[in-house]
């Protein structure tokens, strides 16, 4: 009887040991999950977000706005550009050293031809935080005086300050539009005759040459 009780006791002990060993092997996975949700240290965040050259995908049309007759493949390219934060709101991240890089891009002329050619792009190699440039010139105070000339000058200065605040024609495709700085009116760079020469139609909403609707 004592032998039987002793055997049962050791069997239970062995089962408990095996159960514990199984959970011990699974423990590294739990630690790995905790590591994946680890809080990023302040200095790591600071260094990675500070003003520096970083790879950015840039739209080719942004660099070559006048070549609207082409379709580029790929439509964007990876370039090193200055980006990041500065310690003061009065400062901005600007390039202090630049270089050119040449890439092979496919140029496609719809219904005509396509070829792979070389295109040059600007890259930033060094960046610094420098004082922001004042983009709006301070308006000069008009001298008090009589006459139509003084009134015309005052009207002109008021009109200039208003024209600075024109909303852009299109955020994504600025290169396809032309904006009158005085009236803020947007018009297409492409013309109807230019599109028809390529057997296309001018889309006045997007200012692109599209295939004719049937």
Swiss-Prot record:
Which InterPro entries does its entry note? Cystine-knot_cytokine, PD_growth_factor_CS, PDGF/VEGF_dom, PDGF/VEGF_growth_factor, VEGF_C, VEGF_C_sf
Show the disulfide pairing: 51-93, 82-127, 86-129
Described function: Growth factor active in angiogenesis, vasculogenesis and endothelial cell growth. Induces endothelial cell proliferation, promotes cell migration, inhibits apoptosis and induces permeabilization of blood vessels. Binds to the FLT1/VEGFR1 and KDR/VEGFR2 receptors, heparan sulfate and heparin. May play a role in increasing vascular permeability during lactation, when increased transport of molecules from the blood is required for efficient milk protein synthesis.
Which SMART domains does the record associate with it?
PDGF
Record organism: Rattus norvegicus
Tissue-wise, where is it found? Expressed in the pituitary, in brain, in particularly in supraoptic and paraventricular nuclei and the choroid plexus. Also found abundantly in the corpus luteum of the ovary and in kidney glomeruli. Expressed in the ductal epithelial cells of post-pubertal mammary glands. Expressed in the ductal and alveolar epithelial cells throughout the whole period of gestational evolution, lactation and involution.
Compartments reported by the entry: Secreted
Family per UniProt? Answer: Belongs to the PDGF/VEGF growth factor family.
Classification via Gene3D superfamilies: Cystine-knot cytokines, Vascular endothelial growth factor, heparin-binding domain
Q: Where is this region: Disordered?
A: 131-159
Q: Is Nucleus a UniProt keyword of this protein? A: no
Name of the protein in its database record: Vascular endothelial growth factor A
Q: According to the UniProt entry, which residue ranges have a biased composition of type Basic and acidic residues? A: 131-142
Q: Which residues are glycosylated?
A: 100
Q: Which GO biological process categories is it annotated with?
A: angiogenesis; angiogenesis involved in coronary vascular morphogenesis; apoptotic process; artery morphogenesis; blood vessel development; blood vessel morphogenesis; blood vessel remodeling; bone trabecula formation
Q: Which gene encodes it?
A: Vegfa
